Amino acid sequence: MTTESKTKTVTHILGYPRVGAQRELKFAQEKYWRGEIEQKELLAVGSELRQRHWKDQSASGLDFVTAGDFAWYDHVLTTSLLLGHVPARHNNGFPDLDTLFKVGRGQSQNSCGCGEAASDMTKWFNTNYHYIVPEFSKNDKFNVSWSQLFDEIAEAQKQGHNVKPVLLGPLSYLWLGKEVNDEEVEQGFDRLSLLPRLLTAYQAIFSKLSALGVEWVQIDEPILALELPKAWADSFKLAYQVIQSDVKLLLTTYFDGVEHHLDKITKLAVNGLHIDVSAAPDQLDAIVSALPKEWVLSVGAVNGRNVWRADLERLHERLQPVKEALGDKLWIASSCSLLHSPVDLEQETELSKETLQWFAFAKQKLREVTLLADALDGNQNAILACHQYSQPLRERESAEHINKPAVQQRLAAITPALAERAEAYSVRAQHQAEKLGLPLLPTTTIGSFPQTSDIRQQRSAYRTGKLNEQDYVTAMKGHIADAVERQERLDLDVLVHGEAERNDMVEYFAENLNGFQATRFGWVQSYGSRCVKPAIVVADIEREAPITVSWTQYAQSLTTKQMKGMLTGPVTILGWTFPREDITRKEIAQQLALVLRDEVSDLQQAGINIIQIDEPAIREGLPIKKSDQKAYLDWAVEAFKISAASAKSETQIHTHMCYSEFNEIIESVAALDADVITIETSRSNMELLKAFEDFNYPNEIGPGVYDIHSPNIPSQEWIVDLIETAAARVPVERLWVNPDCGLKTRNWKETEAALENMVKAAKALRKKWQSNAA
C-alpha cells in the first residue's frame, strides 16, 4: 500500500492553446487584418484569453501557470521580435504588432496587396503547427526590443499567479532559422557563428526576468531530441555557462528522447530537465540514473499531442519508483505544449457518453497532471481516482466494434505487387499525352477555391438539419458550376471542382469513412489565425460508398476540359488526425490506403482521367531522429502507392506537397511514382527545386509560382521570372504552372487576379518557347 509522501510533486504544463475555446483569437486577428477593429480591441481579446487560461491552470491545482506561451502568430516569430531580429525589408525601427504581422503575412491590415514578401514558413518539427523561419545574415544584431514576454509575466503576477515563463532557447532559435544570403554562405558564414551575439541578448532577457522576481524559467531546447551535428551539440555547454543567472532554468525537451545527448546535458549550467516520456518512454530510466542530484526532473507524462485520456493508473505504476528515487525533485507535466490539443472537451455535447470517456482535451489534461501528481504523493483518494479514470480505456481494449475482421483480412492480403502501377512512368506518360492533349506549361490549381460565407452557412445549415439534402446538393452544385465557369473564363487547362462541399481536406474524408470520430470544437492552431479540426481515429477504417465521385462527375459534365479528382492521401489523413494509440501508425496508413484505392477505381470508372492524391504532410510525419526515418518512409511510400496503383496507365496521378524540405526525402518522393507532383516553392524563390534538379527527378513537376498564404497579388512579371527560374532546373516539357497550395482561405477577387496573371505568364512563355523551338 502506498503511503502519503512528505514531498510534494510539483506540477506544470509546457504551454496552453492560445486560440480560445471558441477561436476568439482567430476571429479577432482576422477582423484586425481587415481593418474592422482597432489594435486595442485585438489586444483586449488576447488579454482576456490569457487571463482565462491562467485561471484554468490555477483552478486545476497546478503549482505554476505558464506565461510567454501566448503568440499573435507563432512563438518563434514572437521570439524574433523579442530579440529585435526582424528582416530588413520589414524593419522600420522599433518593432510593433504590425511589424510582426508583416513578417508573417507580408502585410498587416488590408492594403494595396503589394507588401513585402513574408518570411518563409515551415512545420514545427513533426507536427501540423507552423512557424515563421528566422532569417540570418552575418551582420545581424540582437537586442531586447519587444516587451510582450515581460508584460505578460507582469499581467499574470498581477492576477496573483505563481508564474513560470517559457522561452525558446538560443540554440534552438538559431537552428530553426536559415541563412538567407547565398554569397555569405559561399564565403563560409554559418548562423551558429551568431551565437555569442545572441547570448548577449539572452543575458539581458534573464536580467529583466530576475527583476520581475521570476524563480524558474522553462527554456525550450527541442533540438536536443535531434541527432545534432557535433558543432551544435558542443555549443550548448558554453551557451548555458554564459546565460546562467540567479533565475533557475528548466531545460525543456520534447517530441523524442534525449538520452543520446545525456552526457552533454548533465554538464549544463541548468537546474532541471524536462523530458517527453509520452513520445519516448524508454529514456526515463537512463535519465533518472544520470540526473545530477541537485536537479529537478520534469516528466512529461500527459500527452500534449493527442486527445486520448491519459492512462493514469499505468502512469502511476510506472512513475512510482521514480517518485521514490527523486522525492521532491520529481515534477509532473504535459509532454509538450498543449497547443497541439483542442481546448475543452466539455463543449462536445454531441459525443456519446462512451466516446467522451475516451478523450481529454487541454483543459482536462490540466487535471490529469495534478491528479497523477497527487497519486504519486500517496493520496489514496487520488490513487483510486486514477484507477477509475483509466477504466473506460480498459473497456475499450476489448470492444468488438473497434477491431473489424473484414479490415483485418484486407490488411493481411497486402503484397508488394498491390503497390505497383501496371507500367513504368515513361510508358504511362505517352498514354497520358495522347489521352489528355495538354499544352506546354499546363496550368491548374491545387484543388480548393474560396470558401465564401454562403458556402459555410449552407454547409452548417445542412449539418444542423436546417437545410434538407436535396437543397444542399443543389446549393453545392451551384458553387461547383460557378467555380468551373470562373476557371473556363480564366482559361486554365486542367480544372478542379473547388471543394465547396468540403469543410477541410482531411475532416471531409474522416466524416465519410467509418472508424473516425469528428468533433464540433476540436480546433487546434496550424499557423497565424488558421485553425484545423482534426478528426480522431477510433476504430478500423472502412468505406461504405464512393465519397467524391458524384461531385467530380458533375463538375466534369460542365466542361470539355479535364477535371481533376481530388483525394487526400493516406499519410496526410493520418498525419492530420489524432491517431489511435493501440495500433501502429503504419497499420492506420494501410487501412486508409485501401479505402482510397477503392475511391481511385471508382473515379476512374466514372470517366475522370486525372486524380490528385494530396500528400502535403508526408515530410512532417518523419521521426525527428534521422536514424528512425527510413522505416517511416518505407511504409509511407507504400501506403501512397497502394492508394494509386489501381489507376490505369492513361490515368494521370498527381500529388501535392507543401512546406517541405525535399533534400533528405527526395528518393522517397520519387519512389511515390506520381505522374505529376506539385510543390510549394514561391516563398523560397524556387530553392526547393534544387533537390529535384540534383536528383534528376524523372516525372512531371509543378512548382508553385505564387504564395497563397499571403494576400499579396503576384504580377505577371513576377510569375514569369519564377517559371523561368524553374525551367532552368526542370525540363520545360515536364513543367506545370500552379499556385503553391489550395485557395480556400483567399477571396475570389484576389484569387482571380492572381490566377489571371498566372495564366497570362504561362501563355507568354508558352508562345516564346514554342517559337524558339520552331
UniProtKB/Swiss-Prot annotation:
L-methionine binds at residues 446-448, 499, 614. It is an enzyme of class 2 (transferase). It catalyses: 5-methyltetrahydropteroyltri-L-glutamate + L-homocysteine = tetrahydropteroyltri-L-glutamate + L-methionine. Zn(2+) binds at residues 656, 658, 680, 741. L-homocysteine binds at residues 446-448, 499, 614. Binds 1 zinc ion per subunit. Pathway: Amino-acid biosynthesis; L-methionine biosynthesis via de novo pathway; L-methionine from L-homocysteine (MetE route): step 1/1. GO terms for biological process: methionine biosynthetic process; methylation. CDD domains: CIMS_C_terminal_like, CIMS_N_terminal_like. Its cofactor is Zn(2+). Keywords: Amino-acid biosynthesis, Metal-binding, Methionine biosynthesis, Methyltransferase, Repeat, Transferase, Zinc. The keyword Transmembrane does not apply. The keyword Calcium does not apply. Catalyzes the transfer of a methyl group from 5-methyltetrahydrofolate to homocysteine resulting in methionine formation. Belongs to the vitamin-B12 independent methionine synthase family. This is 5-methyltetrahydropteroyltriglutamate--homocysteine methyltransferase.
